Amino acid sequence: MAVVHRILRRGLSAASPLPSLRGLLLVSPQELGRRPASSSSSAAAAAGDVEAELRAAREDVRQLLKSNPCHPILVRLGWHDAGTYDKNITEWPKCGGANGSLRFGVELVHAANKGLLKALFLVIPIKSKYAGVTYADIFQLASATAIEEAGGPKIPMIYGRADVADGEECPPEGRLPAADPPSPAEHLREVFYRMGLSDKEIVALSGAHTLGRARPERSGWGKPETKYTENGPGAPGGQSWTSEWLKFDNSYFKEIKERRDEDLLVLPTDAVLFEDSSFKIHAEKYAEDQDAFFEDYAEAHAKLSNLGAKFDPPKGISLE
C-alpha cells in the first residue's frame, strides 16, 4: 500500500504530465489478485471461493459505510469505471466499461474523475484482502452496496468481471457526461446511447444524484457550502441536490421539478429532465412514485454495471 500513500501525498490532477502517469498502477502487481486460469474440474471450486470472498468484501464495504459516510463517492467510482463503454466497439477491452481500468493513473487524471483517488483509497484496503476479487468487481460491488445501504433498492448484481492488465488499455478521455454541455438533452443522449441505454434509463440513473454533493474545486459547479453541507457529515462543504443527501429516495426529482430552494443544486443536465418531452415522462413519474423509480433504477444500475464486462464464469456469480 506504500504506492497508494505516496500518490495521496503527491496528489493527481488533470494537469499532471501524462508520461509520468501513463500505466501507473495504484498497487503493486503482486496485489492485483488476478485469477489464474483454471481447469474445468476446478472451476466450480474456484467460483465458490470467489463467491465467499465477494460476500466478505461486501460485508467490509457495509462496515466502511457505517463508519464513513462515503456512499456518494463509492457510487461514482462504479459509475465512472463502467460509463466509458462504447457499444460500437466490439473488441475487449477497447470497448471500455466495467473492467477495473479506473485504478490506473492515466485514467484517474481525466477531468471527469477528479476526486476519485479518495474512493480508491477507501476500497483498495478491502480489495487487497481478497485475492479472488477483481478491481472491476470491487468497484461495482462498492457502488451497488452504497445505494442499498443509503436506503435504495436492492440491485440485482452479478460478479466475476475480468480486470484490464495495464494502463495502456484505459479508454480515451471524453466518454463520461459533462455538467454543462451546449445542448444538455443532446449530450445526455449522445453519451448514454453510446452505452446502449434508453431515455428511461438516462432519467432513472440521473436519480442517483439524490446522493452526494458537487464541489466547485472539483467540478466547477456548486456553492462552497450550504445550510445542508456546512457541517458535514463527512468533510463539510459543497452543494447537494437534496437536503438529505445521504438518503437514497426520489427527492431529487421532486426538488428538480419544484426548484424552490436556492441551496439545492440544479445542473443544466438535471433541469433538462423536466424540459425535454421524452425525459419528462419518466421524471414526472419518478417524482410521484418512488416505488416505480426504485424498480427502474435497480434495473438500470445493474445494466450499467455489466457494460463492457467480461465475466468468468460467463454467466457471472450471484450473491443472492
UniProtKB/Swiss-Prot annotation:
GO terms for cellular component: chloroplast stroma. It is found in: Plastid, Chloroplast stroma. K(+) binds at residues 210, 242, 249. The active site is at 80 (proton acceptor). Residues 214-228 have a biased composition (Basic and acidic residues). GO terms for molecular function: heme binding; L-ascorbate peroxidase activity; metal ion binding; peroxidase activity. Expressed in leaves, stems and flowers. Its EC number is 1.11.1.11. It is an enzyme of class 1 (oxidoreductase). Residues 1-42 form a transit peptide. Binds one cation per subunit; probably K(+), but might also be Ca(2+). Belongs to the peroxidase family. Ascorbate peroxidase subfamily. Plays a key role in hydrogen peroxide removal. This is Probable L-ascorbate peroxidase 5, chloroplastic. The lineage of its organism: Eukaryota, Viridiplantae, Streptophyta, Embryophyta, Tracheophyta. The gene is APX5.
